[in-house]
UniProtKB/Swiss-Prot annotation:
It is found in: Cytoplasm, Cytosol; Mitochondrion outer membrane; Mitochondrion matrix. The modification Phosphoserine is found at residues 13, 85, 123, 127, 154, 157, 283, 285, 508. It comes from Mus musculus (Mouse). This is Mitochondria-eating protein. Residues 110-124, 179-209 have a biased composition (Basic and acidic residues).
Length: 537
């Protein structure tokens, strides 16, 4: 219906009809009778077309209303209208016929030539008025049939829609039942999984206290064993120190043999000691554990600076009692410092290996956690370092060093305190992250202003290092503290002497024999293997 109505609105038939009526009114007096009749017939034809379209729209509208709707409206309004129009048409026909009879009689005398045309138009109008009611009745019958068919079709479609709705409701109920069943099964599975997880967590929680208790028992047993071993070692060391004579009263050979036997016995005792085979866990010192790496580094740098400014000068004073040459004294102290760092680094490596062996059975974490535990243990147990053994190793290395030429009466045991302090500093520096170490130095190398400062008696224009007074302290490749070196132009080549395999056996006439550190019996030394002149210095 909407499409037919849109077509009627777009065709503008009613507006064209109104325009024609207006045009006919304006030209009615100037037109002839035939022209006016033609205008009237055209208007009737146009009205008939519009009426036919309206009847089609009426039929479609009635079909949309169904079998019951619109019937009363058609009966009440359309049928009476059609009846009145038919009766008015008939009455108008008689009146018009009478009027036409009188008018025809009057006009026949005037327009005898136009009478046949007028009769023909009149007969056409009469025939059209007679056929129009029959056409309207036929249209009504057709519209009734179409309305009945539309009603039957609508009832059928309504029944089909109701059946489809019922089927959809049944499907919806089945889907809801399936969804409820799935939800129940998923909830049951989740509850079972939660129960199993709760049971597993309970089991693990029950097992963890047992493991913790066993670990604590092992730890306690290890502590007891370590305390017993350390107390035994302490008593042995105290008895040994009480029985050992002063290092300056015996002969050099006796001291050397004693140091060798002592070192062998200590190495043997260390190898057989339970502390070396399986090191025990000690409770960390609270003060040392609280110290951060930065604080320990600052403290070690301060100790190293104090060793340069105070301990080095004290050692020089001790050596100057027996040696007049300042160059030899400074060389001895530099070599002692370098050897102390070397021996302390080796001792730190062995100590770290023992700690790893000790902590390996109780390690349950990753490698990083294990290394962290090893480092923390070493930091908290730096007092376990055997510095006296390192001092003996340093003195042995100095005795066979070919670069030191000095009177044989001077014993390097004079530098025991200095060497022990340097060994402790170097050992503690290896526990830092990153560790600190001294720079490599060799006689005759090019002077590096970033590593060393020149001594007061140096030639400040000389490019080569004559000898080193104090090593530079390094952190990776960065200089932390500068060392000290002596530079002299041309003095290095003039001072080169043949390398001596052993120290001289002749007595020194420089100092009296009653001075500290001078032996009454000459001491011979066995030849030592030739070392590289530039090794570690």
């Amino acid at each position: 219906m909407a499409e037919s109505l849109k077509k009627l609105a777009k065709s503008e038939s009613l507006q064209a009809l109104q325009d024609k009526v207006t045009y006919w009114v304006n030209d009615y007096n100037s037109n002839s009778c035939d022209q006016n009749l033609n205008y009237c017939i055209e208007l009737i034809e146009q009205v008939a077309k519009v009426q036919a379209q309206l009847f089609g729209i009426l039929t479609v509208t009635a079909q949309e209303g169904g079998n019951n709707e619109g019937v009363e409206t058609i009966k009440c309004r359309l049928l009476p209208l059609l009846q009145t129009s038919f009766s008015s048409v008939n009455m108008g026909k008689t009146a018009e016929s009478e009027m036409c009879a009188t008018q025809d009689f009057q006009l026949r005398s005037k327009n005898r030539d136009n009478s046949p045309d007028q009769d023909q138009h009149q007969s056409d109008n009469e025939s059209f008025s007679e056929t129009q009611p029959t056409q309207v009745q036929d249209d009504l019958a057709e519209s009734g049939k179409s309305l009945e068919g539309a009603k039957n079709g609508s009832t059928i479609s309504l029944l089909a829609a109701e059946e489809e709705i019922n089927q959809l409701k049944k499907q919806l109920k089945s889907l809801q039942a399936q969804e409820d069943a799935r939800h129940k099964t998923s909830e049951n599975r989740r509850s079972e999984a939660l129960k199993s997880d709760h049971r597993s967590t309970k089991r693990t929680q029950d097992q963890r206290p047992q493991d913790v208790v066993s670990n604590y028992e092992k730890h306690l047993q290890n502590l007891k064993e370590e305390i017993a071993v350390l107390s035994a070692e302490k008593s042995g060391l105290q008895g040994r120190s009480a029985r050992s004579p002063s290092p300056s009263t015996g002969t050099r050979s006796h001291r050397r043999g004693r140091s060798r036997s002592h070192s062998r016995s200590r190495s043997h005792s260390r190898s057989n000691s339970p502390c070396t085979t399986v090191a025990k866990i000690r409770s960390p010192s609270p003060n040392r554990a609280k110290m951060s790496s930065v604080a320990r580094k600052a403290a070690l740098l301060s100790r190293f600076s104090d060793a340069y400014s105070q301990a080095r000068l004290d050692a020089q004073c001790l050596l100057r009692r027996c040696i007049d040459r300042a160059e030899t004294v400074q060389r001895i102290i530099y070599i002692a410092t370098v050897e102390a760092f070397h021996v302390a680094k080796m001792a730190f490596r062995h100590f770290k290996i023992r700690v790893r062996k000790m902590l390996t059975p109780s390690n349950v974490g990753s490698n990083t956690d294990f290394e962290t535990a090893v480092s923390e243990y070493i930091v908290c147990h730096l007092d376990l370092y055997d510095s006296q053994s390192s001092v003996n190793d340093v003195i042995r290395a100095m005795n066979v060093n070919p670069k030191i030429s000095f009177p044989p009466e001077v014993d390097f045991c004079l530098l025991t305190d200095f060497i022990q302090e340097i060994c402790c500093i170097a050992f503690a520096m290896q526990s830092l992250e990153p560790p600190l170490d001294i720079a490599f130095g060799a006689d005759g190398e090019i002077f590096n202003d970033c590593k060393y400062r020149r001594s007061y008696d140096s030639d400040f224009t000389a490019p080569l290092v004559f000898y080193h007074v104090w090593p530079a302290l390094m952190e990776n490749d960065c200089v932390i503290m500068k060392g000290e070196a002596v530079t002299k132009r041309g003095a290095f080549w003039s001072s080169v002497r043949p390398v001596m395999r052993c120290r001289s056996r002749s007595l020194s006439p420089i100092c009296p024999r009653n001075h500290f550190g001078i032996s009454t019996v000459s001491r011979s030394r066995s030849p030592s293997p030739i070392r590289c002149t530039f090794a570690r210095y």
